[in-house]
UniProtKB/Swiss-Prot annotation:
It catalyses: 2-[(2R,5Z)-2-carboxy-4-methylthiazol-5(2H)-ylidene]ethyl phosphate + 4-amino-2-methyl-5-(diphosphooxymethyl)pyrimidine + 2 H(+) = thiamine phosphate + CO2 + diphosphate; 2-(2-carboxy-4-methylthiazol-5-yl)ethyl phosphate + 4-amino-2-methyl-5-(diphosphooxymethyl)pyrimidine + 2 H(+) = thiamine phosphate + CO2 + diphosphate; 4-methyl-5-(2-phosphooxyethyl)-thiazole + 4-amino-2-methyl-5-(diphosphooxymethyl)pyrimidine + H(+) = thiamine phosphate + diphosphate. Its EC number is 2.5.1.3. This is Thiamine-phosphate synthase. The gene is thiE. The lineage of its organism: Bacteria, Pseudomonadati, Pseudomonadota, Gammaproteobacteria, Pseudomonadales. One of its GO terms (biological process) is thiamine biosynthetic process. Pathway: Cofactor biosynthesis; thiamine diphosphate biosynthesis; thiamine phosphate from 4-amino-2-methyl-5-diphosphomethylpyrimidine and 4-methyl-5-(2-phosphoethyl)-thiazole: step 1/1.
Length: 207
């Protein structure tokens, strides 16, 4: 599977009361990867929501990933995204199998990206590139890092952190394969606007 396009990431608080409707609206507009991100301890709700997302993703032909929970990913037969505090990728790869999509947060570090690649990552994620509500204290990345990564890392590159339709185009131009977006997509007032934004993000890869 070619990993290129919009990488939508859910936020349970942002999507409260409109979770599945807004996610389906994004899928309608076109999503390469969908990450279920929920940091709560409510395991039953997380399983229920992840199962609902899996059904939607199957309908739209989108790959689902679970944030920071390889066991839940294995239970559902989907991929996982791991941060730097979640341990090495090797156990997750052993648990999920060779075909699973496994992503790794690399902040602004080419060294972390090289390590992730050696451990079997499917893609690496750099960021934050702009001010981010979700990760305000994350190390800053820039297009110079992106260009270096493009030359050195032989994996798809995701970019994250405050990405909107107003600032995403230069990231694609400098080598980003995946635009990882939360508020810039799901912060829309209506499902129709979510779909419009998804299509507009994808259009950046067609030009």
């Amino acid at each position: 599977m070619k990993l290129r396009g919009l990488y939508a990431i859910t936020d349970s608080q942002l999507l409260a009361g409109r979770f599945l409707s807004h996610v389906e609206a994004a899928l309608e507009g076109g999503v390469c990867l969908l990450q279920y991100r929920d940091k709560s301890d409510d395991a039953a709700r997380r399983l229920r929501e992840a199962e609902g997302l899996m059904k939607l993703c199957e309908r739209y032909g989108t790959q689902l990933l679970i944030n920071d929970d390889a066991e839940l990913a294995a239970r559902l037969g989907v991929g996982v995204h791991l941060g730097q505090t979640d341990g090495p990728l090797t156990p997750a790869r052993a648990l999920l199998g060779r075909q699973a999509i496994i992503g790794s947060t690399c902040h602004a570090s080419l060294e972390l990206a090289a390590q992730a690649a050696s451990e079997g990552a499917s893609y690496v994620a750099f960021g934050r590139f702009f001010n981010s509500v979700t990760k305000p204290g994350a190390p800053a990345a820039n297009v110079g890092l992106l260009e270096q990564a493009r030359a050195q890392v032989k994996l798809p590159i995701a970019v994250i952190g405050g990405i909107t339709l107003d600032n995403a185009a230069p990231l694609v131009a400098h080598g980003a394969d995946l635009l990882a977006v939360i508020h810039g997509l799901f912060g829309a007032d209506s499902a129709q606007e979510v779909t419009r934004r998804a299509r507009a993000f994808n259009a950046l890869f067609a030009s």
